[in-house]
From Swiss-Prot:
Encoding gene, per UniProt annotation: rpsG
Function: One of the primary rRNA binding proteins, it binds directly to 16S rRNA where it nucleates assembly of the head domain of the 30S subunit. Is located at the subunit interface close to the decoding center, probably blocks exit of the E-site tRNA.
InterPro entries: Ribosomal_uS7, Ribosomal_uS7_bac/org-type, Ribosomal_uS7_CS, Ribosomal_uS7_dom, Ribosomal_uS7_dom_sf
Species name: Vibrio parahaemolyticus serotype O3:K6 (strain RIMD 2210633)
Subunit: Part of the 30S ribosomal subunit. Contacts proteins S9 and S11.
NCBIfam families: rpsG_bact (TIGR01029)
GO molecular function, one term: tRNA binding
UniProt keyword list: Ribonucleoprotein, Ribosomal protein, RNA-binding, rRNA-binding, tRNA-binding
Protein name per the record: Small ribosomal subunit protein uS7
Record-stated family: Belongs to the universal ribosomal protein uS7 family.
Length: 156
């Protein structure tokens, strides 16, 4: 525990177009080398093409994709008497969002489409339909936690 006062989390400003804090956080995660305007352009282009393809609202698809990628549990390493156990722990809400966004961006970067906006749009559409690499990553994390359920009593 820190002896000084605990510093609260920095308030993030909502994005200029949709006034969404989640979307602003997503832009920040996508951003490379501090190029925020480029990241915003990529995200907005991806959202526009997604809305065009599916006929749904921009933010609705984004929220649905995030919801399908958010992990409920994850495993953390815990050393007990010389051996290391993978202990399943529940994921805090802020970390859930952060992991989901990070996994979406990683999965989009590995795709084969031409531009990053196309890759991101395709990955988010897949995630909103419960398929794709990011959803597979969440399933793997859940499977790992399920397999190590026996060590849940080592939680701290």
């Amino acid at each position: 525990m820190p002896r000084r006062r605990v510093i609260g989390q920095r308030k993030i400003l909502p994005d200029p177009k949709f006034k969404s804090e989640l979307l602003a956080k997503f832009v920040n995660i996508l951003m490379v080398d501090g190029k925020k305007s480029t990241a915003e352009k990529i995200v907005y282009t991806a959202l526009d093409s997604m809305a065009e393809k599916s006929g749904k609202d921009h933010l609705a698809i984004f929220e649905e994709a995030l919801e399908n990628v958010r992990p409920a549990v994850e495993v953390k390493s815990r050393r007990v008497g010389g051996s290391t156990y993978q202990v399943p722990v529940e994921v805090r809400p802020v970390r859930r969002n952060a992991l989901a966004m990070r996994w979406l961006v990683e999965a989009a970067r590995k795709r084969g489409e031409k531009s990053m906006a196309q890759r991101l749009a395709a990955e988010m559409l897949d995630a909103s339909e419960n398929k794709g690499t990011a959803v597979k990553k969440r399933e793997d994390v859940h499977r790992m936690a399920e397999a190590n359920k026996a060590f849940a009593h080592y939680r701290w």
